[in-house]
């Protein structure tokens, strides 16, 4: 929810909070290591009024962080939120370069993640090589979704693979498509 346009004072506070968040990140990371918790800290950010600090982390398993929460509350003296994020959110937060050589879509312009299925790769006649159709997050490439409808529409105009067509007065079998 956007309440208003940020003014100079808000921007100054935001920049101060970013510096504060970097220090808080390091402190939290150290406390996690000391506590031997199976979680990987990804990011830390403060609300504009610094009344709450949000720590984002990944973990393969459920983590009991009650003791961690107590330790963090005693250090930071504000509300603490521990937010577990998935692989796509992690990639969005950290950023990086995709297989295509461009900045990650999720980090540069995607607002929400749409469902992507292996059928989209099949529909686009891509080789089902998981390494080639997976993003840096380990999930199917988000861009498979962008072109899916276009491939569905254009494939309607072509004969199906395995069907027979007439070409230059000859019966020919369709063995492949290159869309």
Roles of regions detected by a PLM:
Residues 1-121, 125-127:
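Acidic-enriched and Gly/Ser
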Residues 178-179:
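Basic/aromatic-rich interaction segments and small domains that mediate binding to polyanionic partners
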Residues 96, 100-167, 172-175:
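Conserved glycine-centered short motifs in functionally critical loops
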């Amino acid at each position: 929810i956007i309440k208003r346009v940020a003014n100079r004072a808000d921007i100054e506070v935001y920049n101060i909070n970013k510096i504060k968040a970097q220090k808080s990140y390091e402190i939290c990371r150290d406390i996690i290591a000391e506590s031997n918790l199976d979680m990987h800290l990804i990011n830390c950010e403060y609300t504009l009024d610094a009344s709450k600090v949000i720590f984002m982390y990944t973990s393969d398993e459920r983590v009991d962080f009650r003791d961690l929460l107590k330790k963090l509350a005693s250090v930071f003296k504000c509300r603490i939120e521990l937010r577990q994020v998935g692989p796509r959110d992690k990639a969005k937060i950290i950023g990086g370069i995709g297989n295509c050589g461009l900045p990650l879509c999720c980090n540069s312009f995607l607002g929400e993640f749409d469902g992507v299925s292996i059928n989209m790769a099949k529909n686009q006649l891509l080789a089902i090589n998981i390494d080639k159709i997976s993003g840096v997050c380990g999930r199917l490439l988000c861009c498979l979704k962008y072109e899916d409808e276009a491939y569905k529409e254009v494939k309607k105009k072509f004969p199906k693979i395995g069907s027979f067509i007439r070409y230059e007065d000859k019966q020919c079998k369709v063995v492949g498509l290159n869309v």
